[in-house]
Amino acid sequence: MQLELLNDQGLATAKYEAPETVFGRAYNEDLVHQIVVAFQANARQGTRAQKDREQVKHSTKKPFKQKGTGRARAGMTSSPLWRGGGRIFPNMPDENFTQKINKKMYRAGMASILSQLAREGRLAVVDSMKVDSPKTKPLAAKFKAMNLESVLVIADEVDENLYLASRNLVNVLVVEPRYADPVSLVHYRKVIVTKAAMEKLQEMFA
């Protein structure tokens, strides 16, 4: 699979030969969906909580007499039928949303995503992504010159300058290969990978 090798202006100056084992696989939509959903589920904190009728702090006094008012009978204001009452099936903080994906499936799914990005022209290679200072403005100008509005940058090493320069940019995420995840790969319109990071991706997902 041949990928575009971009310069600082976003122009393709050469071709980068990527191995078919990682960047030339068939797209497996079911597998990609499975690893994306599993990644999102595993990222959940599981701390959301609501109260049932027992946990809501309300008086147990009967709100009005049983008969003679014309209203539906009511026992206490903590009933789920009442405003401010407890939930019938509340979310509990001890819920476990973890989904297990074995390593072989995960590697195959990531390779499938990378292959599809390459076929769609959304994956490109650059020599490096070094910046001289932690200033955001020069890096933003560089991405603008390359016509990149929504971009995931996978760099072999994210030093302090690159991290500080990129963290305040909208629709820009800079990560090292080990932190590349399926959700980010499918979310951003363009994925830019440095040459050294390409070698690491090949080792990880071959």
From Swiss-Prot:
Residues 46-77 are annotated as: Disordered. The keyword Ribosomal protein applies. SUPFAM superfamilies: Ribosomal protein L4. GO terms for biological process: translation. The keyword Nucleus does not apply. One of its GO terms (molecular function) is structural constituent of ribosome. Keywords: Ribonucleoprotein, Ribosomal protein, RNA-binding, rRNA-binding. One of its GO terms (cellular component) is ribonucleoprotein complex. Disulfide bonds: none annotated. Residues 58-70 have a biased composition (Basic residues). Part of the 50S ribosomal subunit. One of the primary rRNA binding proteins, this protein initially binds near the 5'-end of the 23S rRNA. It is important during the early stages of 50S assembly. It makes multiple contacts with different domains of the 23S rRNA in the assembled 50S subunit and ribosome. Belongs to the universal ribosomal protein uL4 family. HAMAP family: Ribosomal_uL4_B. This is Large ribosomal subunit protein uL4.
